[in-house]
């Protein structure tokens, strides 16, 4: 269930359960596991039960070094094992995501362009966009355009490009030759179920003065 929940995180490629089954009930070196599976990160966990109480220990590890990125323990009532399992899965996936994102962004910031994939360029674009400084919007735009060069099917790249142009248009920092609304609409067509694309589209509408569309 946790594998399923983590696979819903847009920027993650998660190793299938059958690939990890060989390590069940074993204590292999995390670095070897990561190398065998081609994984950048490894999630490790254990369950202990005492009476009606159950404790889940989870840790997120960096594959190459085995370094801890995040760890937490969860306690619950074991009377309804399915309910507590669902609670654990939801909590772990929700709390792990920002730590994974921060780690991935920091990794992407250390890469040269030649080493980057489209997702790395998107991490760089979002990092600059989220700083909300005038100069950073231009840099975010450049990274979004680079992501589009690498993979024009990335809806989020078009959304970031659109919102950066919309902000720059509002700030009158640069002549805008492309329509931010059209770029945002292209993003939604490519990634209709991406909440971040829809959120950025709302910002584009807001900058265009269409508050009704922004709120929808």
Kindly label every feature range from the protein language model.
Residues 1-139:
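Catalytic-center loop of serine/cysteine hydrolases
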Residues 136-142, 170-186, 207-216:
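Structural signature of tandem alpha-helical TPR/SEL1-like repeats
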